[in-house]
UniProtKB/Swiss-Prot annotation:
Reaction(s) this enzyme catalyzes, per UniProt: ATP + H2O + 4 H(+)(in) = ADP + phosphate + 5 H(+)(out)
PANTHER family (UniProt xref): ATP SYNTHASE (PTHR15184), ATP SYNTHASE SUBUNIT BETA, MITOCHONDRIAL (PTHR15184:SF71)
Protein name according to UniProt: ATP synthase subunit beta
Gene that encodes the chain: atpD
Protein family (similarity comment): Belongs to the ATPase alpha/beta chains family.
Organism lineage string: Bacteria, Pseudomonadati, Pseudomonadota, Gammaproteobacteria, Candidatus Pseudothioglobaceae
Main localization (coarse): membrane
EC main group: translocase
Length: 459
């Protein structure tokens, strides 16, 4: 074990001087002897000084304090002992439930699996959310992004997905809270507890109020735990909320380390940092990692470098739109903007593909006709267009759905709709079978059978 001493402290950046023969390597974890604070080596400056980022608050530090090199990167506990626990970036428990007592620790910096170890993803993962299963189906072992601006429902959608998939899917889940609100982390913990799925979920939190080092590395901590489960032969779900905060923490660290900023003030290493994280989130011949990531879109601009860099790595993108939310339709998924590589007749089958494309084409036609309707009114449309508009408005409302995790706010019981029922429902609307039903009958409801049941008397 080699020791050095602190020579400079600038916020979260701490310089440490070592002797000639004991220079730490990049990404080595150092421990401040007096406070127990962990530092991660980012740069070697020359004159035997290394520049580090603190994995915690730097209050109470002073120049001259002794620092010990642990001789390797940050290591975190992995395995079944982490299930049902809340941990920080260093894998230390923060839920006041005692030691984790793990037998195995893994370093958070690892290489992505080799090309020959990878396994392609073609099997569908049913979520029970109509709009997602129909328009942008998820692949088991794929990567999904939930894109949206502030307050359009990314976290609520993610909580619903976790609840539905964790109950239906018997594998393990890892939730990595990156730079999000502490309140949401607390709500999430209690939601998992009440749904009786907490014993299958590992929770790793690095909240908004924590230093940039914690927020930058907490995604890697969660990913390392998921990789262990995958390599043990399990199918794992990895939830990251929010990838944008990961990028933002990287921007802060980059500026603190004195790097020249790139476009819109982001770090020059944005693409390589994102690639290093995303390439590790993959499925191998041993097991799979299905990843669902919330992506905040600054100022609702999808061309911003952060969301734009994330797009390249994903198999499916669920775009949450403010325009849809303004209509009171939740989940506020934009069916025309959301995409999935799985929406292919060879994967989902001809019927599913044709119904999904039919729904998109009717909604696109309605979008084109909106200006004419606003200026001239419905009467000026052809009979065919009137039918299209009527069906589009029913489809729009039928894409809404009551969530289990929102029951306390809405008072409406949540609904899980199977993929088969979803396809049957939208096909019935497209084929004109539901033309006699009022629009409002389709709002915030589960399957098409419920629409028929509740409106039997009215017809």
């Amino acid at each position: 074990m080699n020791t050095g001493k602190i020579t400079q402290i600038i916020g979260a950046v701490i310089d440490v001087e070592f002797s000639v023969d004991s220079m730490p390597k990049i990404y080595d974890a150092l421990k401040v002897s007096e406070t127990g604070l962990t530092l991660e080596v980012q740069q070697q400056l020359g004159d035997y000084v290394v520049r580090t980022i603190a994995m915690g608050g730097s209050e109470g530090l002073k120049r001259g304090l002794k620092v010990t090199n642990t001789g390797g990167p940050i290591k975190v506990p992995v395995g079944v002992k982490t299930l049902g626990r809340i941990m920080n970036v260093l894998g230390e428990p923060i839920d006041n439930a005692g030691d984790i007592g793990q037998e195995v620790s893994w370093a958070i910096h690892r290489s992505a699996p080799a090309y020959h170890e990878l396994a392609p993803a073609a099997e569908l993962l049913e979520t029970g959310i109509k709009v997602i299963d129909l328009i942008c189906p998820f692949a088991k072992g794929g990567k999904v992004g939930l894109f949206g601006g502030a307050g359009v429902g990314k976290t609520v959608n993610m909580m619903e997905l976790i609840r539905n998939i964790a109950i239906e899917h018997s594998g393990y889940s890892v939730f990595s809270g990156v730079g999000e609100r502490t309140r949401e982390g607390n709500d999430f913990y209690h939601e998992m507890k009440e749904s009786n799925v907490l014993d299958k979920v590992s929770l790793v939190y690095g909240q908004m109020n924590e230093p940039p080092g914690n927020r930058l590395r907490v995604a890697l901590t969660g990913l390392t735990m998921a990789e262990y489960f995958r390599d043990e032969g399990h199918d794992v779900l990895l939830f990251i909320d929010n990838i944008y905060r990961y990028t933002l923490a990287g921007t802060e660290v980059s500026a603190l380390l004195g790097r020249m900023p790139s476009a819109v003030g982001y770090q020059p290493t944005l693409a390589s940092e994102m690639g290093a994280l995303q390439e590790r989130i993959t499925s191998t011949k041993k097991g799979s990692i299905t990843s669902i990531q919330a992506v905040y879109v600054p100022a609702d601009d999808l061309t911003d470098p952060s969301p734009a860099t994330t797009f390249a790595h994903l198999d499916a993108t669920v775009v949450l739109s403010r325009q849809v939310a303004e209509l009171g339709i939740y989940p506020a998924v934009d069916p025309l903007d959301s995409t999935s590589r799985q929406l292919d007749p060879l994967i989902v089958g001809e019927e599913h593909y044709n119904v999904a494309r039919g729904v998109q084409s009717v909604l696109q036609r309605y979008k084109e006709l909106k200006d004419i309707i606003a200026i001239l009114g419905m009467d000026e449309l052809s009979e065919e267009d009137k039918h299209s508009v009527s069906r589009a408005r029913k489809i729009q409302r039928f894409l809404s759905q009551p969530f289990f995790v929102a029951e306390v706010f809405t008072g409406a019981p949540g609904k899980y709709v199977s993929l088969k029922d979803t396809i049957v429902g939208f096909k019935a609307i497209l084929d004109g079978e539901m033309d006699d039903f009022p629009e409002q009958a389709f709002y915030m409801i589960g399957s098409i059978e419920e629409v028929r049941e509740t409106n039997k008397e009215g017809l």
